[in-house]
Every structure is written in structure tokens, then in C-alpha cells.
């Protein structure tokens, strides 16, 4: 159950980061309203706070989080941008998630 909770926390953290970066991209690249910068800042603030909830040292958290970030970013590509994923996308995400699991499930040193 702990692994599932951690995976959900990683996924929500990644989503907060992606939203926080996507909204300014809309403002800068597509000329959307500057008001989108308000929820973007809130989302990035949420992202930073969520990082504090992760149970490992910061460096290990960032390393493991990277695997989930890749998977969530590809989900964003598919469901928000509407671009079909390739087998290479899916294979890369699977490899990244396995790497995340190796880091997260290592034996405790305490």
C-alpha cells in the first residue's frame, strides 16, 4: 500500500509541475490571457509543497520522481495535446518507471 501511495504522490506532484509550466507556455506561445499566470504560480507552489511530502532525501526523491514525471508527461501528450503515443514512448516510460521502482524500493538504511 505504501508503494501505491507514493506512486500517487509522485503522479500528483508531476501533474502540478506540468500544469504550472503549461499555462505560461500557453501565454507565451499562444497569446492566451496573462491571468493564466495566477493558476500557474499556484500550481508550481503546490508542486514545491508536494515535494516536501516525499519520504526520502531530496536528491533521491528527485531521481525517483523523474520516472513518474516522464510517464505523466506522456499522458499529457496523449490526452491534452491529443498526440498518439508510439511504442518508443511507451517503452521509454516503462523503463523510467522500473528505474523509479528500483530507487523507491531499495532496502532501508536506517
Curated annotation (Swiss-Prot):
Q: Record's InterPro entries?
A: UPF0060
Query: What membrane topology does the UniProt entry give?
Result: Multi-pass membrane protein
**GO cellular component, as recorded:** plasma membrane
Keyword DNA-binding on entry: no
Parts of the chain that traverse the membrane: 8-28, 33-53, 65-85, 88-108
Could you name the domain of life of the organism this protein comes from?
Answer: Bacteria
Record bears the keyword Zinc-finger: no
Q: Where in the cell is it found?
A: Cell inner membrane
Key words, A-Z: Cell inner membrane, Cell membrane, Membrane, Plasmid, Transmembrane, Transmembrane helix
Q: Can you tell me which family this protein belongs to?
A: Belongs to the UPF0060 family.
Protein known as: UPF0060 membrane protein Pnap_4944
Amino acid at each position: 500500500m505504501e508503494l501505491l501511495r507514493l506512486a500517487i504522490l509522485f503522479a500528483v506532484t508531476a501533474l502540478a509541475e506540468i500544469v504550472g509550466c503549461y499555462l505560461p507556455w500557453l501565454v507565451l506561445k499562444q497569446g492566451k490571457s496573462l491571468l493564466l499566470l495566477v493558476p500557474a504560480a499556484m500550481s508550481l507552489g503546490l508542486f514545491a509543497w508536494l515535494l516536501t511530502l516525499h519520504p526520502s532525501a531530496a536528491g533521491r526523491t528527485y531521481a525517483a520522481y523523474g520516472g513518474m514525471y516522464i510517464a505523466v508527461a506522456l499522458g499529457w501528450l496523449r490526452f491534452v495535446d491529443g498526440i498518439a503515443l508510439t511504442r518508443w514512448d511507451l517503452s521509454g516510460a516503462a523503463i523510467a518507471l522500473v528505474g523509479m521502482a528500483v530507487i523507491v524500493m531499495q532496502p532501508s538504511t536506517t
